Amino acid sequence: TTINVKCTSPKQCLPPCKEIYGRHAGAKCINGKCHCSKI
């Protein structure tokens, strides 16, 4: 899932991703935007 959060590293994406998927969230930073996935 792509979310509208700007990023330079995956660490910045983990908190918003955890809000969506809980503690089983995976976070990536692709093209300056956060991508969340459920692990």
From Swiss-Prot:
Site positions per UniProt: Basic residue of the functional dyad: K28
Cysteine disulfide partners in this protein: C7-C29, C13-C34, C17-C36
Recorded superkingdom: Eukaryota
A GO CC annotation given for this chain: extracellular region
Location in the cell: Secreted
Pfam families in UniProt: Toxin_2
Keywords recorded for this protein, A-Z: Amidation, Disulfide bond, Ion channel impairing toxin, Neurotoxin, Potassium channel impairing toxin, Secreted, Toxin, Voltage-gated potassium channel impairing toxin
Isoleucine amide: residues bearing it: I39
PROSITE patterns the record matches: SCORP_SHORT_TOXIN (PS01138)
GO function terms (MF aspect): ion channel inhibitor activity; potassium channel regulator activity; toxin activity
Tissue: Expressed by the venom gland.
Domain notes from UniProt: Has the structural arrangement of an alpha-helix connected to antiparallel beta-sheets by disulfide bonds (CS-alpha/beta).
Physiological role: Weakly blocks Kv1.3/KCNA3 voltage-gated potassium channels.
Family listed: Belongs to the short scorpion toxin superfamily. Potassium channel inhibitor family. Alpha-KTx 02 subfamily.
More about this protein: This toxin is only found in female specimens.
Record protein name field: Potassium channel toxin alpha-KTx 2.18
Organism of derivation: Centruroides limpidus
